[in-house]
Amino acid sequence: MRERIAAGQKCYEEKRSAEKNSEGEHRIKEVDAFKGFLIFAVVFGHFLLPLKDSPYSFFGRSFYLIYSFHMPAFLFLSGYFRQKSKRKKGAKLRSLLSYLLLYLFMKVFLHLSDILFYGEQDLFPDFWHESSTPWFMLVLFFLELTLTPLDFLQEKNTKLFKQDSKRDDFLFLYLFFLMILFIPLSFSPIGHKVKDFLALDRFLSFGPFFYLGMISGESHFSFQKIPKLPCFLGGIFAISLFLFLPHVYPYTRVFYGTWGYRIEREAILPFFKAYAVLLRIGFIPFSLCIACFFYHLIVLFLKRGSGKLSSSLSSFLVKMGKYTMPIYVFHRPFRDAFFASGAGGFVLLGRGNMAQALLFYFCLLFLSALLLFLLARDSLNLFCRFRFWGK
C-alpha cells in the first residue's frame, strides 16, 4: 500500500513538473513582468483612490495616469491570451463557471469588508449591481458568452473553419462587428435606467479592448516587435496627462468605463458634448499607447538593468505577473482596513507638509508591493482558477 501511495505521489509530482515546464515554454518573460507591473498599478491605484482629491496633486495625477491604461491593458491581454491558448473540450464551461463563481465570491468577500470597515448595514450584498472591483469578473463572463457563436462553429468543424483564411476573415468580421456595436450602445439612453446593472456599462465600454486583444492574437502581432511609434505617443500622452491633469480632468470620466451620458454631462467642450462617442473611440488608442509606453519601459529595464536590486525587482515583477488573479481578488480588504484605521487622513485634509505627503506616497508604494508579495500564493491561485475541477 505504501509503495502504491509513493508511486502515486511520484506520478503526481512528475505530472505537475511537466505542466509547469510546458507552461514555462509558452510564457513570455517581458509580458509576465508587464502583468506584474499592471497588477501593482491596480493595487497602488486602489490605495490612491481615497486620496485622489487630496490637496497634494501628485496623488490624483498618479491615480488618473494609472486609470488611463491599467484595465484596458488587462482586458487586451485577456483577449490576446484567450485567442492564443489551445482550448480543450469543456474549457468554455469551466471559464464561465469560474468567472461567475469568482464574481459571487468577491461580492460576498468585499461586502464583509464593507460591513467591517465602512459600516455597511445591509446583511446581503446586491448581486445585480456592480461598479466596484468585482466588475472585472462579470465583464469577462459576458465577454466569454459573446464568443459562443465562434466556439460553436469551431467545435462543429464547419466548412468555414476548415480553411484558415476563411476562419481568420470570419473571426475578424465578427469581433469587429462587436466592437462597432458596443461603442454606440455604451451611449444608449437605456444607461439612465440600468446604471451599473450587472456592470453592463463596463462590459460595453471595455469590451473593445478584449476583442482587439483577440484580433492581435490571431494576427502577426508580436510583443517582441511592438513598433516604436505607439510607445513614443504613449509617453507623450502619459506625461501630458500627468502634467496637465487640471485642464483635461473633465475628460477623465471616460477612464472609468461609464455610460455615455455621464461623459456628456461633464464640463467638456460643446463639440465633444455633441459627439462624445469620439472620446470613447479616441480613448482606445490613447490608453493602449500609454500601455505600450510602460511595456517598453519594462522591457528596457529587463534588458539593461544590472545589479542585485535590478535583478530582484525583475524577478519580483515576473513572479507577480503569474499571480495576477489572486492578487486582484483578495487585495482590496487590506486597503479598506488600512484607511479604516485612520491612515492618510492628514493627506486628504492637507494637514501635513509636502515632505510628509511624499513620505506617505512612498509608504503606499511599499505597502502595495508588500501586498503583492503576500498574496502571490499557489494556494490562492489554484482557488481562483478552480483547478480542482480538472484541466
Predicted regions: what is each one?
Residues 2-391:
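Alpha-helical transmembrane segments and their immediate juxtamembrane cytosolic regions
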